[in-house]
Structures are given as structure tokens and as C-alpha cells.
Amino acid sequence: MQIMSRPQMLVVAAALGLAFSQTVLAAPAAALAGNPLATASTLPFHYPAFDKIKDEHFLPAYAEGMRQQLKEIDAIANNKKPATFDNTIVAMEKSGALLTRVQTTFGNLQGANTNDKLDAIDSEMSPKLAAHGDAIYLNPKLYARVKALYDKRDSLKLDAESKHLLERYHTDFVRAGAKLSAADKEKLKAINGVIATLQTTFTQNVLKETNASALVVDTREELAGMSDAEIDAAAAAAKAKGKDGKFLVALVNTSGQPPLAVLKNRAVRSRLMAVSLARGANGGEFDNRQVVLKIAKARAEKATLLGYENYAAYSLEDQTAHDTAAVNKLLGELAKPAVNNARKEAADLQAVVDADKGGFKIEAGDWAYYTDKVRAQRFAFDENQLKPYFELDNVLINGVFYAATKLYGITFKERKDLPVYNPDVRVFDVFDADGKQLAIFIADMYARSNKQGGAWMNEYISQSTLLGTKSVVANHLNIPKPPAGEPTLLTYDEVKTAFHEFGHALHGMFSNVKYPRFSGTSVPRDFVEYPSQVNEMWAVWPEVLANYAKHYKTGAPMPKELLDKVIASKKFNQGFMTTEYLAASLLDQRWHQLTPAQIPTDVLAFEAQSLKDMGVDFAPVPPRYRTTYFSHSFSGGYSAGYYAYLWSEKLDADTVEWFKEKGGLKRENGDWFRAKLLSRGGTDDAMNLFHNFRGRDPVIEPLLERRGLTGK
């Protein structure tokens, strides 16, 4: 679950702290005549005209967008008048209107609905966009104006948000290399171009390798345990790939694969686990091992050039964690108890295998299957009992939306008149409690072969009172689409994901800021997952669950005893879940705490040794992502930042306790959370926002209790 919980994008204006303006400041060039990207969409809230946008529109719009922004930046940098907040900082906030529109639209479509043409454009534009960013942030005249304002910021009589914006711009320039010598700036530009190209290659390799690695089986019997609908879908997928009469089991992003929980055939489970873990290291054209080494080295070189010990130190300085010591401490303290719990869980699973006279030791491919058996014994239910109560439309309308209405007073109305890029995409108007339209919400729920894996939120239009814009946000999930006429039944994890991603959407839709630099989810990476994690609590809140968890055939509510078992089982398998997450987080840190001279030559050997060194080398529980398909770390914006989910969960667990103390699903609670935190975006230090909401700093005890790490 990522926001970045969003597709892998290079939204230049966002990354640079520049505007999400939707108004072109200069007349589009003749080359853009008839190009729908040339001007802001005339649809409500500047919603993209998906029916008019074609692949061939992007490259000329990119070129003109970069030209326009550089012209605007040149005018700011060479302004003969002394620097003022308005003629420098605000002017930069308003720059790049066309480029922002092009890059936002392209990045979102390339994540959700890509093709070979878009992939080729991405490969071509990534280094060009990196160079474009360098041309702005390494402009000495522009930095001189920013620094002049920064040095006298206390005497400028700026309001709090404006002062924070000035400070952020100064920080952004310094971190981008504005203080480097001319020679070192040229070195940095070259490194940035290399990184941009490599990250694009990594992303495309992961998607292509994941598709190419789908497991093909010969007989229906081998898929025993999967539902008839799932097996029929596997047959249809195989036929679509020219393998008529066979069955194709597609892969998801993570190491673990959903069918592993139900497949009865151990040989098939082992094959499925093996192809998942081998992705990106098969020796073919999509092998990512050399790409990983080059990315790690380039990032380490960038950090060294900027004066940091390693890339993690550079990356974390700008997060709420601030340094590697804090992250290493958190992850290190949790690793041993988490693995101990996982070993205890493995013993429970082995006992079931032995009782069944299985004659084998539990391996990674067996874990989910026997976990379900133990869950069924201990709590007397399994996933298949839950799914009939989790029909997609009920979950979204009567669950996710219902909770938001009860908490915040917002309402939703589906509309069919706006264009979409895929027929399965749905669009909703979102209205505030006073009846005024707040935002437009796009729901893209189904998996597709041309859609990146995982789940994320992104914004097509970001809220800003300076620019007069309101939010157009989208949630993307990867729920397998059932055969025509069959209901879409979700797993419990998919239900939680739907609530999680809508937490990101609320963060975007509730944004009430002046400057686009601070809009919505424009907060530190280790804070951005916090509001979305909080929103997960409503998935099993009794009033909410009773409203949506109804049998898709009979409409009967989920029996209370089944709900009680679901809630009672929440700590179950936490050893596994915490260990697989920690293993990935620690790998992410290990790769990014290397100096250029320490980059290894063998990716898999380094990975194995790192897991051993960190005490999380427990074979039945592989990392949630192995290095060669770890998109968060090597292309998805979470480099040296995968720890952020756990860091944010500390805030989340503490906030859940606050909601419970205050009576839970009450409008006054939602209004307080919205006013103090969700609406504020990045207008203040993230931990100040938390303190203002909670009345104190966060404590870790609720997280330890949730994860079963208290030793009780």
C-alpha cells in the first residue's frame, strides 16, 4: 500500500516544490494546437479529458511545458527588482502550469493504464525531467534570491504558512545542491540523470517480469482450493495468453501470493512461491540485479557529493525520523521479538503438518496455507467464510463512504458523464456537510496487466486557494476481476486496503491550504501513511461493519460471532507480518547506508548476508519484497524510507486509542481530526501537527500492544 501509498512518478513541479497550477501562463506554442493538454480542462474541477488525451500528445506537451517553465524561472531569477516573497517565492509556486498538468496526467496514466508507447515516453523523459529540475534548483541567481529572503525571514512579517514555505524552498535548494561548486553541480546533474533512467528501467522491468512470471498449470485439479470463479478466471487468463486449456495464476507485487492461502497442492504452492521470489533475478532481459547495483552506487555518490555519509542519511534528514540512528533503533528493537514470535507461529504450523502426517518442514510456500488452518482451528473461521460478506460495492459505498459520512459529514454521488481511461473506473462527486462540492473521487479497483501492482492514491488536481483549485483524487487497488456476471468478493486484507487508500484520499480532499507546495499529502514520507492507517480502524468498527458486511446473495449481516472471531484474530500471525515487513525495511536501509566503495557485486549474496546480520534470516518468512522487485525502494519514492509504514503506525496506533477514548465514530471526533491534521497538509512541521491534534507527543505502547510485541 503506497501513496507513492501513489504511482511511481516524476512529478517535477511537486518534487521541486513548484505549483500545481492549472492555468497556462503563456500562450501554447503552435505545436500544441489541438492538444488537449495545452490548456486546463474545461470539465468540472479541471478533471482530465481522458477521452481526448492520446499518447502522441505527451511528448510535445512535455517539451512546451519545460520551455514555458524555464522561461518563467529565468524571468524570476533575472528580475531587476530586489527579491520579495511575491516576486520570487509565490512566482515559483505559480510556475510550471503546463508541465505540472502534463506530468501529473502522464504519471498517473502510466501507473494505471500503461502501454509500450507510454513506457517509451517515460524512458525518454525521465532523464530530461531530471535535467529540467537541475536547471531550476542549481540556478545560482535563483538561489541567491531565495537565500536573500531566507536570511531576513524573521523581519518579513509573513504569516506562518508563508514563512514555512520560504523555509521549505531554502531547504529544497540546499538539498538539491545549490551550494555546490560549478564543477560539482555538473557532476550532480549527470548522477541525477543516471538515477532517473535507472529507476524507470527498474519499474518497467518489475511490471514485465511480474507478468512474464505468472504460473502456468496444466490441470484444474492442481488449483484445488481456489474457488470455481477464480479457476475460471485463471483459465481465461491462460487463453488470453495463447495457452488454451491451461491455467494462469498471475502474481502480485509482494513475495507472498494470495492463492498460497488456499492451494491444497503443495507442489503448486512451492512453484508459485519460487517464481515469485525469483523475479528480477532470472537472468533474462528483465533481470534487475545490475540495475539495483547501479542505482545503489549512483545514490551513494549523490549523497557523498552533497556532503552526507550515505544516501539514507541524506534522505532521512528531511523526514520526521531525521537520521539513520533513529530508524536503526526502531527497526532493531523490534526485529528480535518479531522473529521470536514468527518462530513460535512456525512451531504451531509445524504441529498441524505433523498431525496431518505431512512429513515435511514448513517452508515459505506453506505458511499462508497452514496459517489458515491454524486460524480455522483457533478462531473457527477462514477467509472463505468472510468473502461472501465483502462484496466490493457494499464495501465501498456502505463501508468506506459510510464511515466518512458519519465522521466528517461528507456525501458522495456517482456520476457517469465524465470520461474515464478504462470502463471499470468509477467517478464520484464529493460534497461537504454544507452541500458545497469538495472534490472529485476516482475509484480504479481492478487489476490489469498494464497496471502497476499494489495499491495507491494519487492526485490529478491538488487543492490550493492561491490557484483556486480543488482536489481530483484517485484510489487504485488491484482486486482480481471476476468473470462476467460474478460478484467481486474481497479478502479481509483487500477490505483494509480499500479503507487505507481512502484515508490518503481524505488527506487530499480535505486539504485547505494556500500554497500548492503544501497541499494534501505533501508531507514527509514517514508521516504520509499515518492518516491512511488511521482510516483502517473503521473497517472493523461495529457500526460500520454492520452497515456493509452483508452476504452478497441473501443480504444477511455477518453473524456477530464471526465478526467477534475476526476481531479476536487481529493479533494472529503478527510475528510473520512484522518480520516480513522488518526484513524489507532493514534491507532498504542496508542498501542505502552504503558508501560508494561499499557497493557489493552480488545482489543476492548481499541480501542474504544482510538478513543474517540483522537477525531476520528466517527462511519460512522471506522479506515482503526481495531486492530485485522492491519497487518502493528502487523506483517508487520510498528509497531509505520503507520504514515509514511502521514509523507512521506508531502515530496511528496512538490516534486509534484517542478515537476510542472519545467514543469512536462521532462527528465531533472527525471534525477535530480534520481541522487539526487532515486539512493542514504540509503547512507546519508534521510532529507539531500531531501534537496539536493529540495534545502530546506519540507513545509507542499502543503499537507494541497491537503487534503483539509486549511479551504478554
Region roles according to the model:
Residues 161, 165, 197, 204, ...:
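Active-site-proximal, well-structured secondary-structure segments within enzyme catalytic domains
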Residues 75-80, 84, 311, 413-417, ...:
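Surface-exposed patches in mature extracellular/periplasmic domains of secreted proteins
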Residues 29-54, 225, 241, 246-248, ...:
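C-terminal, non-catalytic "cap/extension" segments appended to globular domains
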Residues 480-499:
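Short pre-active-site segment immediately N-terminal to the catalytic Zn-binding motif
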